[in-house]
Amino acid sequence: MLYEIKNDKLSISADTFGAELHSIKLDGKEYLWQCGDAWKRYAPILFPFICSPKDRTYKAGGQEYHMAANHGFARDSEFAFSGSTKNSLSFILKDNDVTLAQYPYHFELEVTYSIKGSKVTVTNTVKNTDEKAMYFYLGGHPAFICDIQGGKCTVEYEKNEHIVQPCLLYTSPSP
């Protein structure tokens, strides 16, 4: 389900599916990628992995686990809407049978989107609800609309980067 908040400058909407932002509009202009054929997402939450382990398989506590998707399961999970204020939306994902089959940890992942003036703030809170140590990665993958008109846009990097394999960049040439 899609939820929206707005003020006099900014409006955002986010979905319970993946706790994913679907829109960021400033003065009525959309700044978030609107899910086209090139990429069918907007701004996924990456948890408990960024990219994935080799062959999507890893060991934890002496047992082998298989992560079903690249970047973990949060982006493909239904979050509960946990509340809103005039300026914020919050979503929560708790471990369940599907997550525990891929990731042997008890957790709560809360994602809160807040707006103030023309600023959007994203707050991610991961809570370990078990006694044992919990290992995870957390990231955001927002896609922004680039206003490319007449070829006046360039992409520059501070260092030369080389793609060694999907999801791996190195700043020095590969062997």
Where are the model-predicted features located?
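Beta-strand-rich N-terminal accessory domains
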Residues: 1-60, 64-69
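Extended, loop-rich substrate-binding clefts of extracytoplasmic carbohydrate-active enzymes
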Residues: 68-116
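Hydrophobic residues embedded in beta-strands of well-ordered beta-sheets
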Residues: 3, 21, 89, 120-122
